A protein has these predicted regions:
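Short catalytic micro-motifs in class I SAM-dependent methyltransferases
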Residues: 117-118
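A conserved beta-strand element that flanks and buttresses the S-adenosyl-L-methionine
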Residues: 114
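Class I SAM-dependent methyltransferase SAM/SAH-binding core
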Residues: 49, 55-102
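Conserved class I S-adenosyl-L-methionine
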Residues: 1-44, 57-61, 81, 143-165, 203-207
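A short glycine-rich, Lys/Arg-flanked "PGG" loop and its adjoining helix->strand segment in the class I
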Residues: 126-138
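Short alpha-helix
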Residues: 172-186
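Conserved Class I S-adenosyl-L-methionine
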Residues: 28, 186-241
Length: 241
């Protein structure tokens, strides 16, 4: 799939899943906020960039803990849903349409730049991480949260095959070592990391992606048994000069 075809697939799938995304994110907002508060220990003065924000799951979770959030996505439908919620509940959250690999912001304008469950949806994750790094100031931090590829590459290959059947916008899961290498390549030092297991009901997981009809049958035929995903959290900062 070319970059243009992948971009079209991403927009189509997320545009069709807006209501399900909003409902899912609202159901876990308080849990995510508690995780963010513990992991980031925000001061309340941060200006935060959320790249690949979707309808605002992370943006709205972190908003009460910081000064300002700028949420970026490429899908107009999810941006519209996010803006509507921001106007009602979170005046310190702004939604901007932009490409995660080419952000329209000046260097060093944010205290924290985050990519939350975003990297497995992009064809060039190294460009996105480079943009996150460019966007933070000298004392800024980068947060990456994503599902981690299994250590066994054959298991990872089969898992990516299922994920693409479920959601054509999926590219590939990155191994833990790749995420660490991307941060290191941009001059960042990993300050904190952790992993946890997330059990997934396959039927509900397919529903969330709007996977139906023949697509659903194919995805079910290759779905992992007792699907448990490994989720990694990575917090990095610039190396001291």
């Amino acid at each position: 799939m070319s970059d243009a075809e992948h971009a079209d697939a991403t927009q189509a799938r997320f545009a069709a899943s807006v209501e399900r995304m909003v409902e899912h994110e609202q159901s876990r907002r308080e849990e995510l906020r508690a995780q963010v508060r513990r992991f980031l220990e925000p001061t309340g003065d941060e200006r935060v960039l959320d790249v690949g924000a979707g309808t605002g799951g992370f943006a709205f979770a972190v908003a009460p803990l910081v000064k300002e959030v700028v949420a970026v996505d490429v899908v107009p439908e999810v941006l519209a849903a996010g803006r509507a919620r921001a106007e009602q509940e979170f005046p310190n959250v702004t939604f901007v349409e932009a490409d995660a690999a080419s952000l329209p912001f000046q260097d060093g304008g944010f205290d924290l730049a985050a990519a939350v469950r975003t990297l497995h949806h992009v064809s060039r994750p190294e460009l996105v991480v480079a943009e996150l790094c460019r966007s933070i100031g000298m004392r800024g931090r980068v947060l990456v949260i994503d599902q981690i590829a299994p250590v066994d590459p054959l298991v990872g290959f089969e898992l990516d095959r299922f994920e693409r059947a479920r959601d054509p916008s999926h590219t590939r899961l990155l191994p833990d070592t790749d995420i660490r290498s991307l941060l290191d390549a941009n001059g960042l030092v990993l300050r904190r990391s952790e992993q946890y297991q997330e059990a997934r009901d396959v039927d509900g997981y397919l529903d969330l992606a709007g996977c139906a009809g023949d697509e659903r049958e194919r995805a079910l035929s290759i779905a992992p048994e007792n699907y448990t995903a490994t989720i990694g959290w990575y917090l990095a900062a610039r190396q001291p000069v």
